[in-house]
Every structure is written in structure tokens, then in C-alpha cells.
Amino acid sequence: MTDSIKKDAKARMGKSIESLRNELAKIRTGRAHTSLLDHVMVEYYGSDVPISQVANVNVEDARTLTVTPWEKTMVSKVEKAIMTSDLGLNPSSMGTVIRVPMPALTEERRRDLVKVVRGEAENARVAIRNIRRDANNALKALVKGKEISEDDERRAQDEIQKLTDSHIEEVDKVLAEKEKELMEV
């Protein structure tokens, strides 16, 4: 009984951390990486698709991405999609290749991004604590229904608390890495 509740809680906490990593990957640091353009949508024959489905995205050097659309007709659409995204990038096309230089971040912008990153991490912590609460409520319901003893409930709650602590520690680790990455000049 309690095992399924613990497994569910662990899986959901893992998803919260994965979600945090995905959100943080979208936040631009001064360094170029291909996941930066993952959420940029390009119009392709009437429907919006992710840029990765219409072009190759590669890292040329530490501050430059190259985007190579698979069809020559898509060059201007891909360039426009990157320009109009909320990333503040200015792509330039040279024939069939689009180069996307990463502008250096100002100190003020870095501090703003650190605040955003901390907010995302706090959201992940809250989500993990909510999962703990849900699991504990499920355990209480089992005790009420006399399916498990109060001792079993206490043991399971302790294990869920350990899970919560380890996942929140993981969130803090991910946050520290991203902050360090943001503050590098």
C-alpha cells in the first residue's frame, strides 16, 4: 500500500526537477547552447513547429549558434522566428546558414536572470512540498480506512520526508549550477 504512494511521490518529485531543468535551459546565459532555441516555433506550411523540426542547430563557438534550415525557402522564416522570439537575439543569414551571435549579458541583466532562476527554483520546491502533502494525505486516508497501522504511516511519512529533502537538495544543486553559469563573465 505505502510503496505505491512512495513510488508515485518519487516519480512526481523527479518530474518537478526535470521541469525545473527544462525551464532553466530556456534562460539565456552568455554562452551558446542548442537547447536555447528549443521553444522557438517556426511557421511551416501553415502550422507552427519547433525549430528543431525544420533546421539543424549547432554550436559554432562559445558565443555563436548556427542554424541550417533543411529547405532554402525556410531561411527567412527561421530567421524571423528567432528574431521575434523573446530571447533578444539578432540572427544574420549568409546564404543557407543563419548565424546567431549571443550578446554578452550586462551585470544588471545577469542579476535579473538570477532572480528569475531563484523564482523557478522556489516554484519547484513548492511543487515538491505539495507532492509530499498529497502523499501524507493519502497515508492518512489509509489509516482512517484501517488499511495500515499508525506505525506504518509514521514510517512511510519519514521516508517521504527523506525523499522530499533529497529532491529539494537536488533543486538547490541545479539552482547553484545555473546561478554560477549566469554570473560567469
From Swiss-Prot:
An MF annotation (GO) of this entry: ribosomal large subunit binding
Pfam families, alphabetized: RRF
GO cellular component: cytosol
Broad class of where this protein is predominantly found: cytoplasm
SUPFAM superfamilies: Ribosome recycling factor, RRF
Keywords: Cytoplasm, Protein biosynthesis
Subcellular location per the Swiss-Prot or TrEMBL entry: Cytoplasm
Keyword Cytoplasm: yes
Gene3D superfamilies hit by this protein: 3.30.1360.40, Ribosome-recycling factor
Gene Ontology biological process: cytoplasmic translational termination
Function: Responsible for the release of ribosomes from messenger RNA at the termination of protein biosynthesis. May increase the efficiency of translation by recycling ribosomes from one round of translation to another.
NCBIfam families according to UniProt: frr
Family designation: Belongs to the RRF family.
HAMAP family according to UniProt: RRF (MF_00040)
Name of the protein: Ribosome-recycling factor
Organism: Thioalkalivibrio sulfidiphilus (strain HL-EbGR7)
Lineage: Bacteria, Pseudomonadati, Pseudomonadota, Gammaproteobacteria, Chromatiales
Gene transcribed to yield this protein: frr
